[in-house]
């Protein structure tokens, strides 16, 4: 099958793994990440843009040193080359 179709909200809420790859293509990858209270992903920089969606909970996204409050339903676009942590 080409592409990927699924109930991403259901899969995300059921995910208990820190990182779970659902789909990988030539120019994109779909990954679920579950972060426990008090944890973070660690500061990262990527060569490609990233899109993140917060399915539940609240926290902070730090992009190039600027902190943003995030919560259930938040969408975050991290441009390529941006230092970030969630």
What are these regions (language model features)?
Residues 80-86:
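Ligand-binding loop in jelly-roll beta-barrel domains
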Residues 1-27, 62, 77:
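A short, N-terminal "cap"/entry segment at the start of jelly-roll beta-barrel domains
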Residues 65-80:
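Short acidic-glycine-tyrosine-enriched beta hairpin
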Residues 28, 37, 47, 66, ...:
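A generic "binding-loop/recognition-motif" signal
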Residues 32, 42, 51, 66-68:
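Short, surface-exposed secondary-structure edge patches
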Residues 49-60, 64:
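Glycine- and acidic-residue-biased ligand/ion/polar-headgroup-sensing regions
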Residues 15-16, 31-46:
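Conserved short histidine dyad/triad with adjacent acidic residue
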